[in-house]
Regions:
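Cys-dependent protein tyrosine phosphatase-like superfamily
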Residues: 1-138, 150-255
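Ser/Thr-glycine-rich phosphate-binding loops at phosphate-binding pockets of nucleotides
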Residues: 143, 147-148
Length: 255
């Protein structure tokens, strides 16, 4: 059910990719384990059918409750796919300075650090879903960049991927940003309006289409290693077990 009116048009994702092919401890991550993507809540019925036919059995929705209220769950709600709502930011409005909202690569890196510290329990649950769902798990936020990028990084760290490979995967979204912004504009515009932000003004202060996206993810990984040594320390403290990591690695390398 939606509580905010918006002209919601069903469309195919523009930032969807299987994480298969990335080098991890012991080999290469297989396809069909984890899919990162932009919003799945308003995909077309054909896309929903294709994802399920391709082995999708679980969806991890990292968006805030308000974002979910804007879109509902869409065509995938009609399929036998487990749905896990695990907001990494409970209130998007509270995560930003209303007087000086900063949408820069550096600001995103700081926000990612706050996500890992503040939403570690949700990240642990998400990793358990990926570890134990019988098929493929797809995880998404709105754009498939920030919250999705943080979960992808935690998954790849658990699998033993190198920081450079994690950053490279994250930066692939850069080529899709124009399409992402076009696809998400109606939903994000409705959300910003509901939160009391001026969407047009936010767009003018954003520099996310400029420079290198690497900065944000590199900042997160460097900070985690500097603060903890083991970048998974915040998640371990929140309950991430060696058994879950072992299960993830077993599934990631399975033929």
């Amino acid at each position: 059910m939606t509580i905010i009116d918006t002209d919601l048009v069903l469309s195919a994702p523009v930032n969807l990719r299987d994480l298969g092919g990335i080098a991890i401890d012991g080999g290469v991550l297989r396809e069909g384990l984890a899919i990162r993507t932009d919003d799945l809540a308003y995909v077309t019925e054909q896309v929903a059918d294709d994802l399920v036919a391709g082995g999708l059995t679980a969806i991890i929705d990292l968006r805030s409750p308000l974002e979910v209220s804007v879109t509902g769950r869409g065509p995938l709600a009609e399929h036998p796919v487990a749905y896990h709502h695990l907001p990494l930011i409970a209130d998007v409005g509270e995560s930003m300075d209303r007087d000086k909202p900063a949408l820069t690569h550096e600001a995103m890196g700081l926000m990612y650090q706050r996500m890992v510290d503040g939403a570690a329990p949700q990240l642990v649950i998400a990793l358990n879903v990926i570890a134990y769902t019988p098929g493929a798990a797809a995880f998404h936020c709105a754009a498939g960049r920030d919250r999705t990028g943080v979960l992808a990084a935690m998954l790849l760290l658990a699998l033993g991927a190198a920081d450079d490979d994690i950053v490279t995967d994250y930066a692939r979204t850069g080529d899709n940003m124009v399409a992402i912004m076009a696809r998400t504009a109606p939903v994000m515009g409705a959300m910003w309006k509901a939160l009391g932000f001026d969407a047009d003004a936010l767009g003018k202060t954003s520099s996310l289409l400029e420079g290198s996206m690497d900065v944000s993810m590199r900042s997160l990984l460097d900070t985690l290693r500097a603060q903890h040594g083991d970048p998974l320390t915040p998640l371990r403290a929140a309950g991430l077990s060696d058994a879950t990591i072992a299960r993830l690695r077993e599934r990631a390398l399975a033929a």
